[in-house]
C-alpha cells in the first residue's frame, strides 16, 4: 500500500510510504519537499469536497490518499509562473523504428529466416501496442484526476466565498446599527464629560479604600520582586490612600482640607454637537484633577485628599478616562462612512468576482474526457487486433517449421507482408492516439494554469478583504463595548452618592433591628419554655386517662419553637461610613449630586418597643401559676401518694376526672380563627380563663405540630420522657433563615417583614408558648423520675410533694395577678394590631395602583420605540435594496462591456496560442536533444559510479586493516602504560631541573646515532632501488625487442590478404594485453618499492622531529604499515624509562649526600633501577629482533618476487624458443606435404588431360575429314572464300558479344566468390577468437597459469603465422606461373590474329579467374591439399587444352573447327568452375562445423545469436564483427555485464580487445547529430545491440 498525492499542475501522481498516514500533514509536506523539491510554503493540499488539510491534523483523519481518491497537491510556484507547466513527452525506444523494421522485413526473400524475423517483429509491435495503450490510459486517468482536483479547489473556493459573504453580512448589520446609534453615542460622550467634571469635585472617602489598600500590601508581600514601573504605580496608588499608621482624620479636618483642593476646579461646559468639545472637556477635567493633586503636594497637607476621578483613573492603568474617550473618537473616525462604504462596495465586487461562472466551469471538459475514454476504448480494440495478428504469425511460424516445405513460403510471406502492413497501420493509429492524449493533457494543463492563477489571485484578494472586515468588525464591537463603559461611567456620581446614603441607612437600621430582635428573642424563649412546662405537667396527669384517645384527641401536640434564638449576623462587610461622612459629602459635592445625598429616614420603631413590653408582661403571667395549674399539681401529688400506697393501676381514675373537667374549656383540634375586634371596645375575658390554652384559643391561629413519637407512646401506654423532652426547633431555625434571606433581598416580601404587625404578634405569642412548654417539660421530667422510683423512696417523695404543693399555692396567686396585667396588655395589643392592619392595607392598595400606572406607561413607551425602530429598519432595507438594484444594473452594463473586451482578448489569445504552438515545437526539439544528452550523461555517471564503488570497496578494506592495527597498538599501549604508571612516584617535579644536563648529552648521542643510521639506510635503499630498476630495465628491453620482432612479422604478413589483417589486428591486441600486463606489473613493483621507500623516509623524518621535541631514543622502527603507531609506543616507553632512570639516580645521589637515614629507600631505588635496566635491555632486544625479522621478511619477499619474475621471464623465453622451433618444424612439414600433394595432383591432372586430349583429337580429325569432303564436293572454292570471310566477320561479332557476356558472368562469379571467401574467412576468425576468449577467461579464473596460457597462445599464433606464410608463398608462386602462362597465351593469340584466325579471349580470362580465386582459399593443412590438387588439375587441363589448340591450329585450315574447339574448352572450364565452387563451399562449411558446435553469426544478427564483439578504435566503441556494411554497436548498458569498460572511463591500453556474447535485444538507430558518441556521420543508420556474456559450459 502507498499514499497517493496527485500534483494537479502537471497531472502527475506522487507516491509515498503509508507510514505518513499516521503522521501529521506538516510531516507530509516535509516529505514532499525532500523528495520532489517543492517548498512547503508553495504547497496547498486539498481533499475531495474542497477541505484544505490542516498542518496539525493527522493525514489519516482525512478520507483521501488512495489511487482512486488521492490527495490533491497544488504548487503555487508553478501557478504564479508566467509559463504553464510543460508535460514531458515520452517516446519509447522502438515505436519510431517500426516503419523501418517493416520496410526491411518486406525486402527480405521468402525463406524460413524471413518468417521467423517477421514473427518476432509482429510480437514486438504487439508489445509496443500494449505499452502505448497503457501509457494513453495513464494520460487519460491523469486528466480525470485533474478534473477532480479542479472540482475540489472550486468547492474550496465556494466555501471561502460563503464564509466571506456571511462575514460581510454580519459586518453590514452591525455597522448599520452603529450608524443609527451614532448620535446616541455622541450624547453619551457629552454626558461623560459632565460626569467627569462632577467626579473631579466629589471627594473619595478614606474608609472606602482601606480594604483595597490592605490587599495591595498583601500582594506586595507575596511577590518577591517588582519592576520599576510597577513600584512607581504602587507608590502613586499608596499616596492616594491614607496609610494605616496615620490616625484617622476628623470630619472637621476633611472639611477644612477639601475646599483647598477644589478651589482651582472650574465647571466645564459640555457641547453635545461636537466631539472635540467633549474630548476637551474630559481632558480639562483630568488636568484640573492633576492640578488639585499638585496643590495638595505644594501645601504638604497630611490629609487624605483624593477625588473619585483619581480613583477611577488609577484602577485600570494606562486605560484612564481620557484614553477611553480618545479610543472612542479614533474608532469613530476610522469607521467614517466615507471610508467604509467604498470598502463595502469593493467587497461586493470581490464576491461577484468569486462567482465568475466562466472561470469556474470548464465548458466542454466532460465531453472531451468522454471522447478520450472512447479513444482509449478504440485503443484497446487496436491492441487486441495486434494481439490476434501476432498470434497468427506465431501459428504460421510453427506450421512452417513443422511442414519444412519451401514451396509454402512465398504465399506465407505474401500474407505476412499484408498483415504487417495492417499492423503498421494499427501502430500508426496508436501513435496518433498517443499524440492526441499528450496534446489533450498539455492543453488541459494550460487551461488549468490560467484558471488556477485566477483562483489564486481572487482568493488572495478575498483573504485580504476578509482580514480587513475582521479588523473592522472587532473595531465596531470594541467601540460598542467602550460606549457601554462610557454609559456606566456617566452614572458613577449618582451611584456613588446613592451607595453612600444606602450604607448609612443600613447602618441605622441594623442598630435598631438588633436591639428589637434581642429583646424579642429573650422574651419569646421564656414564653416558650413556660408553655412547654405546663404541657408536660398536664401530659403526665392525663397520659393514663380513659378519655385520652377517645374524646380528647390532639392533647399530645407541641407548639413550634419561635423567636427562641437570635438571628444571624448580616451586613458585616459594609464600609465604615457614618452620618458625619455623609454630611461631609453634602458640604463638598457639587449641586448636581446634592439631591442624591439626603439623610435617610427610618420607620417608627416605637410600636415594636410597646409590643416588646407587652410580651414581657405576658411572659411573667405565663410563668406564674393559675388555679388550673394548681389543681394539676395537686392531682399529681395525690397520684404519687396513691401510687406509694396502692398499685400503680389505680392512678388512672383521678386523671380521667381532671381531664374531663379540662375538656370543656379547649379543643386543640379545631382552634377558633383570629377575630379582630373593634379597638375601642375590646372583648374582656375573666381572669380565670387566662390559661395558656385559653390564650391560644382566643388570640392566636397557629399550627399545632404533633410530637414525632406520639403514636409510639399511645401503643406503649407508658410515656417516653426523652421524646417529650425533644422540641421541634428546626422549624424555628428555618423560619429564622427565611427571615434573614428575605431581609437580604432587594424587594422584601411584605408578609415576612419583621416590622409588620402580623410578624410581631406571631413572634410574641410564640415566645409565650415556648415559655409554657419549657415549664411543662420540667414538671414532666420531675414526675417521670418519681414514677420510676422504688417503693422505699415513696415516703421521701410524699414529703417533698407537700412542700411543692405549698409552693405551688403561693405561685398560683402570683400567676393570677400576672394574668390580670397580661389581659389588659393583650387588649391594647389587639387594638394596635387592628389599626396597623388597616393602615398597611390602604398603603398596599395605593402602591399597587401606582405600579400599574407606571407599568402601563413604560410598556406604551417601549412599544412606540420598537415600532419606530422597525420602521427605520424597513426603510433602511428598502433603500439598500433600491441601491443594490441600481448597482446590479450598473454591473450588468459593465459585464457586457467586459464580455466584448474578453472576446477581443480571446481572439488575441488564439493568435498568441498559435505562436506558442510553434515555440512549443521548437522547445520539444530542444527537449529531445536534452534527453539524448541526459542519456549520455547517465551512461557516464553509471560508469563513474561503478569505479567509485570499486574504490570504496578498496578503501573499506584498507580502513578495516588500519582499524585492526590501531586496536592492536592500543592494546599494547595500554599494557605498557599500565606497567609504567605503577613505577611513577611522588617526587617527579622536584627532580626535573637536575636532569637537564644529562638529557642534553644523551640527546646529542642519540642524534649522532640517528644520523649515521639514516645515512646507512638511505644508502642501502638507494642501492636496492638501483638494482631493481636495472633489472626491470633489462626485462623491459628484452620484452620490447620481442614485441618489436612480433610487430615486424605481423606488419609483413598484413599486406597479403584481408583475412590476415583481421587476425593480425587481434594478435596485436593480444600482444598489447601482454605488454599492458607486463607494464602494470612493472609499474606496481615500482610503485610498491617507491611507496615503501617514501614511507620509510617519512617515518624516519617524523621520528627525528619527535626525538627533537620529546627526547626519545627510537633508532630502528621503520615498519611499513605500523611505523607511526609503533613510534608512538616506543616514544612513550623510552621517555618514561629514561625519566625514571634519571630521577632514581638523582634521588640516590641526593639521598646519599643529604639523607643518610633513608638507606632502605635508597636500596629499593637501586633495585628498581636494576629491574628497569633489565626491562629496557629486554625490550630493546625484543625490538631489535622484531626489526631484524621484519627486514628479513621484507628482503625475502623482494627476492621471492624477483625470482618469480625472473622465472616467468625465463619461462617466456623458453616458450618463445619452443614456439619458434615448433613453427619452423611445422612449416617444413607443411611445405613437404604441399609439394607431395601438388606433384600427385599434377600427375593425375596430366593423365586425365592426356586422355581428354586424345578424345578431342579424334573428334577434331573426324570433323576435319568431314570438312574436306564438303570442300571437295563444293563447285567452286572462290565462293567458299567469300562465304568464309562473311562467316568470319559474323563469328567475330558473335564472339565479341559472347566475350562481353562471359566477362560479366566472370565478374559476378568473382564477386560471389569473394563474398563467400570473406564469409569463410570471418567464420574462421570468429572461431579463432572464441578459442582465444576461452583462453582469456581461463587466465582470469586461474591466476597461477597466466604465463603458461600466454605461452600456449603465442605458440598457436606463431604456427598459424608460419602456415599463412607458406600458403602465401605457394599461392604467389602459382600466381606467377599462371601469369607466365597468360603471357604465353596472349603471344599465341597475337600470332593467331596476325595469321587472320579468330582469337580466344576465353582462354586468357580463365587463368585470371583462377589466379584471383586461388589466394582466397583458407590456410588449414587438411583443406589446402585438396584445393591445391584441384588447382593443379585445372592448370594441367588448361595446359593440355592449349597445347591441343596450338597443334590443331597448324593442322586445321577452317574457322568452324576452331570455333568448335573453343566452345568445348569453354564448357569444360565452366563445369570445372562449378565443381570447384561446390567443393570450396562444402569444405569451408565442414571446417566451420568441425571447429565448434555453436556457430558465430557474422551477418543478420538475431536474438540468441552468438557474436564476436571487438573494440573499434575508429568509433571508440565496441562493435559486432560482421561482413555486412551496416554497423552493429554494443549498448552501453551491456558493458558491465560483459566486464568491459567504456571509452570515457578507461584508456585504450586497459580495454579488452574482444569478447564473445549473446544477443539479447536489437534496436534500429539513426545519427541525428554530427557529433555523437559513436563517431559516425550525420544520418548514418546503424543498430544498437544489447548482449550478455557467453559461457561455453552453459
From Swiss-Prot:
It holds the Pfam family ATG11. GO terms for biological process: autophagosome assembly; autophagy; autophagy of mitochondrion; defense response to virus; extrinsic apoptotic signaling pathway; glycophagy; heart development; innate immune response. A motif (FFAT) lies at residues 731-737. The keyword Coiled coil applies. The FFAT motif is involved in the interaction with MOSPD2, VAPA and VAPB and its phosphorylation regulates these interactions. Belongs to the ATG17 family. Part of a complex consisting of ATG13/KIAA0652, ULK1 and RB1CC1. This complex associates with ATG101. Interacts with PTK2/FAK1 and PTK2B/PYK2. Interacts with GABARAP and GABARAPL1. Interacts with ATG16L1; the interaction is required for ULK1 complex-dependent autophagy. Interacts with RNF111, SKI and SMAD7. Interacts with COP1 in the cytoplasm of proliferating cells in response to UV stimulation. Interacts with TP53. Interacts with C9orf72. Interacts with WDR45B. Interacts with ATG13; this interaction is increased in the absence of TMEM39A. Interacts with WIPI2. Interacts with TAX1BP1. This is RB1-inducible coiled-coil protein 1. The gene is RB1CC1.
Amino acid at each position: 500500500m502507498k499514499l497517493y498525492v496527485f500534483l494537479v499542475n502537471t497531472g502527475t501522481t506522487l507516491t509515498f510510504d503509508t507510514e505518513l498516514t499516521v503522521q501529521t500533514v506538516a510531516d507530509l509536506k516535509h516529505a514532499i519537499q525532500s523528495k520532489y523539491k517543492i517548498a512547503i510554503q508553495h504547497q496547498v493540499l486539498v481533499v475531495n469536497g474542497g477541505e484544505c488539510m490542516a498542518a496539525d491534523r493527522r493525514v489519516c483523519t482525512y478520507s483521501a490518499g488512495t489511487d482512486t481518491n488521492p490527495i490533491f497537491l497544488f504548487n503555487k510556484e508553478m501557478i504564479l509562473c508566467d509559463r504553464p507547466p510543460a508535460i514531458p513527452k515520452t517516446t519509447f525506444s522502438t515505436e519510431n523504428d517500426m516503419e523501418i523494421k517493416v520496410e526491411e522485413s518486406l525486402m527480405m526473400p521468402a525463406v524460413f529466416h524471413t518468417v521467423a524475423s517477421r514473427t518476432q517483429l509482429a510480437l514486438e509491435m504487439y508489445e509496443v501496442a500494449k505499452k502505448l495503450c497503457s501509457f494513453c490510459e495513464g494520460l487519460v486517468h491523469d486528466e480525470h484526476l485533474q478534473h477532480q482536483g479542479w472540482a475540489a479547489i472550486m468547492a474550496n473556493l465556494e466555501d471561502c466565498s460563503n464564509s466571506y459573504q456571511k462575514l460581510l453580512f454580519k459586518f453590514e448589520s452591525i455597522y448599520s446599527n452603529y450608524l443609527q446609534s451614532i448620535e446616541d453615542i455622541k450624547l453619551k460622550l457629552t454626558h461623560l464629560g459632565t460626569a467627569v467634571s462632577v467626579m473631579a469635585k466629589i471627594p473619595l472617602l478614606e474608609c472606602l479604600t482601606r480594604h483595597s489598600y490592605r490587599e495591595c500590601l498583601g500582594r506586595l508581600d507575596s511577590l518577591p520582586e517588582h519592576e520599576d514601573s510597577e513600584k512607581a504605580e504602587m507608590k502613586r496608588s499608596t499616596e492616594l490612600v491614607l496609610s494605616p499608621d496615620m490616625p484617622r482624620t476628623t470630619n472637621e479636618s476633611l472639611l477644612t482640607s477639601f475646599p483647598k483642593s477644589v478651589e482651582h476646579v472650574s465647571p466645564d461646559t459640555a457641547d453635545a454637537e461636537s466631539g472635540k468639545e467633549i474630548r476637551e472637556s474630559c481632558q480639562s477635567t483630568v488636568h484640573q484633577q492633576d492640578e488639585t493633586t499638585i496643590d495638595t503636594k505644594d501645601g504638604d497637607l497630611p490629609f487624605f485628599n483624593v477625588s473619585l476621578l483619581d480613583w477611577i483613573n488609577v484602577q485600570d492603568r494606562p486605560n484612564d478616562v481620557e484614553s477611553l474617550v480618545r479610543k472612542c473618537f479614533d474608532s469613530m473616525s476610522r469607521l467614517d462612512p466615507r471610508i467604509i462604504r467604498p470598502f463595502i462596495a469593493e467587497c461586493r465586487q470581490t464576491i461577484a468576482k468569486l462567482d465568475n461562472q466562466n472561470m469556474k466551469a470548464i465548458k466542454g471538459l466532460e465531453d472531451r474526457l468522454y471522447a478520450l475514454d472512447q479513444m482509449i476504448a478504440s485503443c484497446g480494440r487496436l491492441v487486441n487486433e495486434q494481439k490476434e495478428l501476432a498470434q497468427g504469425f506465431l501459428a504460421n511460424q510453427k506450421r512452417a517449421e513443422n511442414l519444412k516445405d519451401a514451396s509454402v513460403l512465398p504465399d506465407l510471406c505474401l500474407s505476412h507482408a499484408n498483415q504487417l502492413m495492417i499492423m503498421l497501420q494499427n501502430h500508426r493509429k496508436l501513435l496518433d492516439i498517443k499524440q492526441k492524449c499528450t496534446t489533450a493533457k498539455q492543453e488541459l494543463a494550460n487551461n488549468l494554469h490560467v484558471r488556477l492563477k485566477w483562483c489564486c489571485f481572487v482568493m488572495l484578494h478575498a483573504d485580504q478583504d476578509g482580514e480587513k472586515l475582521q479588523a473592522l468588525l472587532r473595531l465596531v464591537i470594541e467601540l460598542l463595548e467602550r460606549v457601554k463603559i462610557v454609559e456606566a461611567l456617566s452614572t458613577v456620581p449618582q451611584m456613588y452618592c446613592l451607595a453612600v446614603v444606602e450604607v448609612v441607612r443600613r447602618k441605622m437600621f441594623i442598630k435598631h433591628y438588633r436591639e428589637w430582635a434581642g429583646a424579642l428573642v429573650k422574651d419569646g424563649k421564656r414564653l416558650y419554655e413556660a408553655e412547654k412546662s405546663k404541657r408536660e405537667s398536664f401530659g403526665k396527669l392525663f397520659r393514663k386517662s380513659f378519655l385520652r384517645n377517645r374524646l380528647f384527641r390532639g392533647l399530645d401536640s407541641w407548639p413550634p419553637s419561635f423567636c427562641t434564638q437570635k438571628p444571624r449576623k448580616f451586613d458585616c462587610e459594609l464600609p465604615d461610613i457614618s452620618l458625619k461622612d455623609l454630611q461631609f459629602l453634602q458640604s463638598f459635592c457639587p449641586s448636581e449630586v446634592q439631591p442624591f445625598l439626603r439623610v435617610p429616614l427610618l420607620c417608627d420603631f416605637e410600636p415594636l418597643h410597646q409590643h416588646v413590653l407587652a410580651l414581657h408582661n405576658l411572659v411573667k403571667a405565663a410563668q406564674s401559676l393559675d388555679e388550673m395549674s394548681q389543681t394539676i399539681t395537686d392531682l399529681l401529688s395525690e397520684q404519687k401518694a396513691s401510687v406509694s400506697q396502692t398499685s400503680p393501676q389505680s392512678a388512672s381514675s383521678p386523671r380521667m376526672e381532671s381531664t374531663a373537667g379540662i375538656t370543656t374549656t379547649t379543643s386543640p383540634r379545631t382552634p377558633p380563627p383570629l377575630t379582630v375586634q373593634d379597638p375601642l371596645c375590646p372583648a374582656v375575658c375573666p381572669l380565670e380563663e387566662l390559661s395558656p390554652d385559653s390564650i391560644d384559643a382566643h388570640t392566636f391561629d397557629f399550627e399545632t405540630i404533633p410530637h414525632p413519637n406520639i403514636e409510639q407512646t399511645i401503643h406503649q401506654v407508658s410515656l417516653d420522657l426523652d421524646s417529650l423532652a425533644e422540641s421541634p426547633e428546626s422549624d424555628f431555625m428555618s423560619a429564622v433563615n427565611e427571615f434573614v434571606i428575605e431581609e437580604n433581598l432587594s424587594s422584601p416580601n411584605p408578609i415576612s417583614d419583621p416590622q409588620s404587625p402580623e410578624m410581631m404578634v406571631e413572634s410574641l405569642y410564640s415566645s409565650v408558648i415556648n415559655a409554657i412548654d419549657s415549664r411543662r417539660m420540667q414538671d414532666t421530667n420531675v414526675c417521670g423520675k418519681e414514677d420510676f422510683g422504688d417503693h422505699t423512696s415513696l415516703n421521701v417523695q410524699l414529703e417533698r410533694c407537700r412542700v411543692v404543693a405549698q409552693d405551688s399555692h403561693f405561685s398560683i396567686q402570683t400567676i393570677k395577678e400576672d394574668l390580670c396585667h397580661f389581659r389588659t396588655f393583650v387588649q391594647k395589643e389587639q387594638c394596635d394590631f387592628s389599626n396597623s392592619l388597616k393602615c398597611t392595607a390602604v398603603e398596599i392598595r395605593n402602591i399597587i395602583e401606582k405600579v400599574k400606572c407606571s407599568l402601563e406607561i413604560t410598556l406604551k413607551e417601549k412599544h412606540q420605540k420598537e415600532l419606530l425602530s422597525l420602521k427605520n429598519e424597513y426603510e433602511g432595507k428598502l433603500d439598500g435594496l433600491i441601491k443594490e438594484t441600481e448597482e446590479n444594473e450598473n454591473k450588468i452594463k459593465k459585464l457586457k462591456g467586459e464580455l466584448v473586451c474578453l472576446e477581443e482578448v480571446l481572439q488575441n489569445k488564439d493568435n498568441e496560442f498559435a505562436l506558442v504552438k510553434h515555440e512549443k515545437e521548437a522547445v520539444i526539439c530542444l527537449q529531445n536533444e536534452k534527453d539524448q544528452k541526459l542519456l549520455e550523461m547517465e551512461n557516464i555517471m553509471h560508469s563513474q559510479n561503478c569505479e567509485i564503488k570499486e574504490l570504496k570497496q578498496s578503501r573499506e578494506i584498507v580502513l578495516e586493516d588500519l582499524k585492526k592495527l590501531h586496536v592492536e597498538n592500543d592494546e599494547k599501549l595500554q599494557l605498557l602504560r599500565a606497567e609504567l604508571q605503577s613505577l611513577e612516584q611522588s617526587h617527579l617535579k622536584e627532580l626535573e631541573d637536575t636532569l637537564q644536563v644529562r638529557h642534553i648529552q644523551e640527546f646529542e648521542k642519540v642524534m649522532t646515532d640517528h644520523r649515521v643510521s639514516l645515512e646507512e639506510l638511505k644508502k642501502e635503499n638507494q642501492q636496492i632501488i638501483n638494482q631493481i630498476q636495472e633489472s626491470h630495465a633489462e626485462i623491459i628491453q628484452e620484452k620490447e625487442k620481442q614485441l618489436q620482432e612480433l610487430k615486424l612479422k605481423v606488419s609483413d604478413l598484413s599486406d597479403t590478404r584481408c583475412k590476415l589483417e583481421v587476425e593480425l589486428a587481434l594478435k596485436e591486441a593480444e600482444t598489447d594485453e601482454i605488454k599492458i600486463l607486463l607494464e602494470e606489473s612493472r609499474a606496481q613493483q615500482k610503485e610498491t618499492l617507491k611507496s615503501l621507500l617514501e614511507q620509510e623516509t617519512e617515518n624516519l623524518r617524523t621520528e627525528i622531529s619527535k626525538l627533537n621535541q620529546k627526547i626519545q631514543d627510537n633508532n630502528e622502527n621503520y615498519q611499513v604499515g605500523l611505523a607511526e603507531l609503533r613510534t608512538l609506543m616506543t616514544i612513550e616507553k623510552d621517555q618514561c624509562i629514561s625519566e625514571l632512570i634519571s630521577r632514581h639516580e638523582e634521588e640516590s645521589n641526593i639521598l646519599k649526600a643529604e639523607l643518610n637515614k633513608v638507606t632502605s629507600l635508597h636500596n629499593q631505588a637501586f633495585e628498581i633501577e636494576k629491574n628497569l635496566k633489565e626491562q629496557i635491555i629486554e625490550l630493546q632486544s625484543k625490538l631489535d629482533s622484531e626489526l631484524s625479522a621484519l627486514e628479513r621478511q621484507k628482503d625475502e619477499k623482494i627476492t621471492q618476487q624477483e625470482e618469480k619474475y625472473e622465472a616467468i621471464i625465463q619461462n617466456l623465453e623458453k616458450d618463445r624458443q619452443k614456439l619458434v622451433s615448433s613453427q619452423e618444424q611445422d612449416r617444413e612439414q607443411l611445405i613437404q606435404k604441399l609439394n607431395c600433394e601438388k606433384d600427385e595432383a599434377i600427375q593425375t591432372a596430366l593423365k586425365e588431360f592426356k586422355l581428354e586430349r586424345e578424345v578431342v583429337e579424334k573428334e577434331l580429325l573426324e570433323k576435319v575429314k568431314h570438312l574436306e569432303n564438303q570442300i571437295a564436293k563444293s563447285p567452286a572454292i572462290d565462293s567458299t572464300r567469300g562465304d568464309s570471310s562473311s562467316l568470319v566477320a559474323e563469328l567475330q561479332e558473335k564472339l565479341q558479344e559472347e566475350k562481353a557476356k562471359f566477362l560479366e558472368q566472370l565478374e559476378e562469379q568473382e564477386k560471389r566468390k569473394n563474398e563467400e571467401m570473406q564469409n569463410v574467412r570471418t567464420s574462421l576468425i570468429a572461431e579463432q577468437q572464441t578459442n582465444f576468449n576461452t583462453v582469456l577467461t581461463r587466465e582470469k579464473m586461474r591466476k597461477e597459469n597466466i604465463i603458461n596460457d600466454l605461452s600456449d597462445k603465442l605458440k598457436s599464433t606463431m604456427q598459424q603465422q608460419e602456415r599463412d606464410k607458406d600458403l602465401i608463398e605457394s599461392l604467389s608462386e602459382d600466381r606467377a606461373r599462371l601469369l607466365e602462362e597468360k603471357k604465353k597465351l596472349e603471344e599465341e593469340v597475337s600470332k593467331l590474329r596476325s595469321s587472320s584466325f579468330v582469337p580466344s579471349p576465353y582462354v586468357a580470362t580463365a587463368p585470371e579467374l583462377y589466379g584471383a580465386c586461388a589466394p582466397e582459399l583458407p590456410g588449414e593443412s587438411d583443406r589446402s591439399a585438396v584445393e591445391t590438387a584441384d588447382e593443379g588439375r585445372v592448370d594441367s587441363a588448361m595446359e593440355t587444352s592449349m597445347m591441343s589448340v596450338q597443334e590443331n591450329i597448324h593442322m586445321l585450315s577452317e574457322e568452324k573447327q576452331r570455333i568448335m574447339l573453343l566452345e568445348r574448352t569453354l564448357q569444360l572450364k565452366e563445369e570445372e568452375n562449378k565443381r570447384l565452387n561446390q567443393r570450396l563451399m562444402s569444405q569451408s562449411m565442414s571446417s566451420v562445423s568441425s571447429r565448434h558446435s555453436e556457430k558465430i553469426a557474422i551477418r543478420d544478427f538475431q536474438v540468441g545469436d552468438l557474436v564476436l564483439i571487438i573494440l573499434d578504435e575508429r568509433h571508440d566503441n565496441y562493435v559486432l564483427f560482421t561482413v555486412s556494411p551496416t554497423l552493429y554497436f554494443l549498448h552501453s548498458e551491456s558493458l558491465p555485464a560483459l566486464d568491459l569498460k567504456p571509452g570515457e572511463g578507461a584508456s585504450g591500453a586497459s580495454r579488452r580487445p574482444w569478447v564473445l556474447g549473446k544477443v539479447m535485444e536489437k534496436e534500429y538507430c539513426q545519427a541525428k547529430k554530427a557529433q555523437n558518441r559513436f563517431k559516425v556521420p550525420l544520418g548514418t543508420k546503424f543498430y544498437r545491440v544489447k548482449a550478455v556474456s557467453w559461457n561455453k559450459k552453459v
